[in-house]
Amino acid sequence: MRDLKTYLSVAPVISTLWFGSLAGLLIEINRFFPDALTFPFFSF
């Protein structure tokens, strides 16, 4: 039961950090390349 409580208290923190960093990354990409359908750094 203690392990379940630990998991339930850690998972929201990890997911909040993950989704927050993902949102920040997407915001920064859209700031440097607005309305881009293809990104220059993915084209080889």
Curated annotation (Swiss-Prot):
Domain of life: Eukaryota
Keywords: Chloroplast, Membrane, Photosynthesis, Photosystem I, Plastid, Thylakoid, Transmembrane, Transmembrane helix
Any GO BP: photosynthesis
SUPFAM superfamilies assigned: Subunit IX of photosystem I reaction centre, PsaJ (SSF81544)
Location in the cell: Plastid, Chloroplast thylakoid membrane
Stored Pfam families: PSI_PsaJ
Gene3D superfamilies according to UniProt: Single helix bin
Major site of localization recorded for this protein: plastid
Mode of membrane association: Single-pass membrane protein
Transmembrane segments: 7-27
CC terms in the record's Gene Ontology section: chloroplast thylakoid membrane; photosystem I
Family: Belongs to the PsaJ family.
Function: May help in the organization of the PsaE and PsaF subunits.
UniProt name for this protein: Photosystem I reaction center subunit IX
Organism of derivation: Populus trichocarpa
